[in-house]
């Protein structure tokens, strides 16, 4: 796989729900891999057709925590994925989750972002991301897709 950065055409934001649905709906996850730690972590979800959806943590690139968002795996997803949803909650300084906001609508503050998938077994958490920004360094995690190679 070539090096993918958040800023090239192969990458897309967590809030691009239609792109995520295009990859996941109708597929099942056969394996979940994790490499790196904290702000360079990449979660890789291997699908039944060989496609891999990668969720990348974000490092804001400064000495502080602005623009830094983690990615943590959720449940072991079982079954065929029927739908995908994103929940973003603006968090309070008291570490209590605040109100649900439109994904991608916040760029200043702190948030918990969850990517859910739905199967015949119900709602399952695929990715949880937490972080903050001051409006300058970037918001949320990002994704990339490695298409299956067919001969």
Which functions belong to the PLM regions below?
Residues 2-151:
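Surface-exposed, interaction-prone regions used to assemble/regulate multi-protein complexes
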